[in-house]
């Protein structure tokens, strides 16, 4: 029943999906089994890449959903900024933010359009790539929409800042965050040498 609910929830409103005579006594494993909240606050920046949003022609919902998820996970402070799809502006801003923020997440510009410049701009700057993060995000998204395969998102470190590039749709951004959040929390615990279950003290 839980699998059915998980597969159907993107296609209807929650109140429209009713599964009767199903009782859950105990649940173990799955993403909810892993920690999704930081032990100590970590600074983060969320950059929304969109010509139309930057011009005020439509509101940003994807970036706001990422900010909300980070806030709930204990990231603080969080810098939020909207900018157009301009490579030079993005590169300069990210390099500036690496001086102050431990985690930098871009939203938008990971597709195959001519103005999707985020990946092409930031990938050459990555000093240590974390391919598994975006592999997890795409695998998670692919179970919900075939369009997840079109994302070219990358992740990795620039100096000591973790940079992650997410899709610009609200669904793509929020699902990617759901997929990578446990790993994201674990990464910053490890980076700060905090002991973790199963690791060496």
Cite the ranges covered by each PLM segment.
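N-terminal small/polar loop signature for handling phosphorylated ligands or for N-terminal nucleophile
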Residues: 67-107, 111-129
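Short amphipathic alpha-helical segments
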Residues: 58-60, 116-120, 177-178
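Short, acidic/small-residue loops that bind anionic groups at enzyme active sites
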Residues: 123-148, 187-197
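Glycine-rich phosphate/diphosphate-binding loop of Rossmann-like nucleotide-binding domains
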Residues: 6-13, 34-85
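Short, ordered loop/turn segments at secondary-structure junctions
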Residues: 24-27, 49-52, 85, 108-110
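C-terminal binding/interaction regions
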Residues: 1-42, 54, 150-201
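Conserved acidic residues
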Residues: 102, 147, 161
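Short beta-strand segments
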Residues: 47-49, 106-108, 151, 165-167
